[in-house]
């Protein structure tokens, strides 16, 4: 298997993991067409674009730790965090999504222990709540 084939297989496995973990719930909430379009966007990413997406995800966790130290969701660091997160979501959803859908997704993080665990384990207890507050602040 060459590098390109290995990369395509890795993307397919990543999407399968997403579908196995969140697929049913995501399809019920956002519809098949939306999830299929997101999956198509992910499969169309080049290796460099995929790596940039992964680096952005890691950078969001670092920025969350930095911003959380301010304890101010309106701080410059928190607003940068919000911008980075929105950019990361746009990679998955594409541009032109509705602000209310994005804010609904983010608010949903607080109701889902998987997301709370993900963000809190990356940046400390209360990180998910802080992320949500920072994003809401950026959208006032």
Annotate each predicted stretch with a short phrase.
Residues 1-140:
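Amphipathic alpha-helical "stalk" segments
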């Amino acid at each position: 298997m060459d590098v390109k084939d290995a990369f395509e297989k890795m993307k397919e496995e990543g999407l399968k993991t997403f579908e196995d973990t969140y697929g049913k719930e995501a399809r019920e909430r956002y519809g098949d067409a939306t999830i299929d379009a997101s999956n198509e966007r992910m499969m169309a990413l080049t290796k460099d674009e995929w790596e940039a997406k992964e680096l952005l995800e890691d950078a969001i966790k670092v920025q969350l730790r930095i911003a959380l130290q301010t304890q101010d969701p309106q701080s410059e660091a928190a607003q940068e965090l919000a911008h980075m997160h929105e950019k990361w979501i746009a990679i998955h959803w594409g541009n032109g999504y509705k602000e209310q859908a994005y804010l609904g997704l983010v608010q949903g993080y607080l109701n889902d222990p998987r997301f709370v665990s993900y963000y809190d384990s990356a940046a400390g207890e209360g990180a998910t709540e802080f992320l949500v507050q920072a994003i809401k602040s950026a959208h006032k």
